[in-house]
């Protein structure tokens, strides 16, 4: 099932009514109150998430989750180690995009995003393929697995102004994608934070995203989410 088909499933069907959606998720936060960044914060966040497995739903196969994710501060040093030519902290933003696995459709979405970014007076420095371990997914989860890309963007020298520019660009990318019938979902777009998430169980997040267990991947905070959809349907925007 591709992302467009998944979105179409959210419409009223059978006894399901989108207007009555509720969920019962688990949320946890690990933070260094002094502001210092370390990989320990990320590791502790993963442990908190795993200890909240009872707050997230999963299928009978124990491999299909309602969703799990983590928001972290942008790991500047880790990004430099990936060979991405970003400027100093606060002078660039990172967008996390979920795109179709089909190469042509994915390329079309990236072209659309790059076009909007350029029209907004921003510069797209680089696009990174986020490494994932698809082998841990169930067959059901693998059918809706997106291609996950990180976009590195520069603009105004002032961080607050750049965040505003990124917000506007993100909204325009989303609108243009919807009008074109493209399956392009922005998980995060900011100069400060980035998101790693998916239709995973709480225990799958660290295994699915190798970045999160890299000792050079650091943050001063880790906000985690374990989703229990209750009477909702699964979709990436609510993970």
At which residue positions do the language-model features occur?
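Flexible, small-/acidic-enriched active-site or ligand-binding loops
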Residues: 235
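Extreme N-terminus nucleophile/cap motif
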Residues: 2-9, 14-65, 159, 166-190, ...
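Extended, highly charged
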Residues: 59-220, 224-227
């Amino acid at each position: 099932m591709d992302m467009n088909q998944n979105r179409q499933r959210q419409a009223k069907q059978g006894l399901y009514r989108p207007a009555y959606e509720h969920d019962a998720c688990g949320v946890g936060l690990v933070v260094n109150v002094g502001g210092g960044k370390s990989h320990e914060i990320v590791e502790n966040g993963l442990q908190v998430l795993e200890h909240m497995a009872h707050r997230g739903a999963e299928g009978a196969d124990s491999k299909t989750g309602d969703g799990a994710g983590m928001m972290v501060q942008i790991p500047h040093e880790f990004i430099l180690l990936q060979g991405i030519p970003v400027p100093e902290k606060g002078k660039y933003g990172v967008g996390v995009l979920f795109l179709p696995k089909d190469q042509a459709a994915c390329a079309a979405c990236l072209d659309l995003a790059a076009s909007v970014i350029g029209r907004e007076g921003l510069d797209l420095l680089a696009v990174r393929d986020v490494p994932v371990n698809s082998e841990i997914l169930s067959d059901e989860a693998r059918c809706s697995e997106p291609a996950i890309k990180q976009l590195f963007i520069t603009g105004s020298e002032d961080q607050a102004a750049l965040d505003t520019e990124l917000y506007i660009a993100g909204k325009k990318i989303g609108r243009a994608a919807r009008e074109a019938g493209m399956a392009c979902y922005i998980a995060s777009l900011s100069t400060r934070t980035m998101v790693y998430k998916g239709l995973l169980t709480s225990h799958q997040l660290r295994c699915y995203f190798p970045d999160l267990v890299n000792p050079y991947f650091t943050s001063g905070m880790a906000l985690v989410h374990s989703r229990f959809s209750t009477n909702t349907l699964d979709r990436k925007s609510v993970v």
